Amino acid sequence: MNSDIPDPSDWIDSKLSGLKDVDETLRCHICKEFFTAPMITGCGHTFCSLCIQRYLTNTSQRCPTCMQEQQISQLRKNVTVETLVEHFSAQRATILRVVKEAAKQPIPEVVEPPSSPDLDDGRRRSGRKRTRTNYTETLVSSDDIQVECPVCQAMLPGAAINRHLDNNCNDTGANGGNWLGTKKKTKPLRKIQRVNQASESVANVRRKLQDEGLSTSGSKQTLFRRYDEWVTLWNANVDNKTPRSKSDIKDDLRRWETTVVANENAQPVKMTIKNIDDRQWVQKHKEDYDYLIEQARKSILKKKQEKEKEQQQQQEGHQKAVDRREDNEPDMKRSETEGYQVVS
């Protein structure tokens, strides 16, 4: 097991080998890392926000898993998966360490000491007493829990939430300042709309780049690609539970331009799916492939039947025309013969 480079294979030789599947499920199908700002597609598959936006923008407008057509506008935040990843990744190293240490320790033999009725009664009474004590401590400590105000999003002790709401969120703590630990949430970041290269002018894109504090140099293609990548990076950052600063996103854009846009004629960056075993892929998606193959066969058979039916109808129509012509020929011959009769 290697906790320095987290990988699902870390669990294979442990007593918790079943966590390998959990570990794999909480990873993005594109980058193979734990989900960052996970987004769910219209077809129900989840990817990192940045990964899926780059993939749909630069590679294909189809889901990398099931190949159904997808649009960026269909993406939605997957809050449940984000929470699962947060908790699992936070405890992953600890669980691995505990499992590894437990595997090295011999299992001690449990020897039951002789018991007496008085001793058992004492244990039961002591257990009940400890239970009551712990319950009391839990009740007392629950008032100290920090909760979020549903109106102003301030954090304050649970016992003070009602008074805080009664005062229209204008009350203060004992020291005259805000409640201990109170911190109002900053204004939520907003996503940026993408531009259509076919209808958007270069001057307008250059103005948008300038408004964002970005470079406005380069050709038309460079400007559009720069702004498109900025929108991808920024919107993915907005999806993140803990967004980074704008300067950090600008640094990401500069690194992208340095490594990807080597010149004006550089091809769009391609998102590739790495480290995939062909046999595992086929086995994992066998049902999907079987379904697609069956649908393709039905489609081919249907087209073939329609073509045969059309040909048969054409042949029948041609045969009817021939039959009608043959039926009319004797009458025509008879009329011609009668027309040449000599009247005496």
From Swiss-Prot:
* Catalytic activity, as annotated: S-ubiquitinyl-[E2 ubiquitin-conjugating enzyme]-L-cysteine + [acceptor protein]-L-lysine = [E2 ubiquitin-conjugating enzyme]-L-cysteine + N(6)-ubiquitinyl-[acceptor protein]-L-lysine
Q: Which SMART domains match?
A: RING, ZnF_Rad18
The family database entries (SUPFAM superfamilies) matched by this protein are listed as: RING/U-box
Q: Where is the composition biased (Basic and acidic residues)?
A: 303-337
GO terms (molecular function) for this protein are: single-stranded DNA binding; ubiquitin protein ligase activity; zinc ion binding
Location relative to the cell:
Nucleus
Q: Which InterPro entries match?
A: Rad18, Rad18_UBZ4, SAP_dom, Znf-WRNIP1_ubi, Znf_RING, Znf_RING/FYVE/PHD, Znf_RING_CS
Under which pathway is this protein filed? Protein modification; protein ubiquitination
Top-level enzyme category:
transferase
| Chief site of localization | nucleus
Task: Report quaternary structure and partners.
Answer: Interacts with E2 UBC2, forming a complex with ubiquitin ligase activity.
Q: What does this protein do?
A: E3 RING-finger protein, member of the UBC2/RAD6 epistasis group. Associates to the E2 ubiquitin conjugating enzyme UBC2/RAD6 to form the UBC2-RAD18 ubiquitin ligase complex involved in postreplicative repair (PRR) of damaged DNA.
Family named by the database record: Belongs to the RAD18 family.
- Specify the protein name: Postreplication repair E3 ubiquitin-protein ligase RAD18
What is the protein's species of origin? Answer: Yarrowia lipolytica (strain CLIB 122 / E 150)
Lineage of the species this protein comes from = Eukaryota, Fungi, Dikarya, Ascomycota, Saccharomycotina
* Designated gene of the protein: RAD18
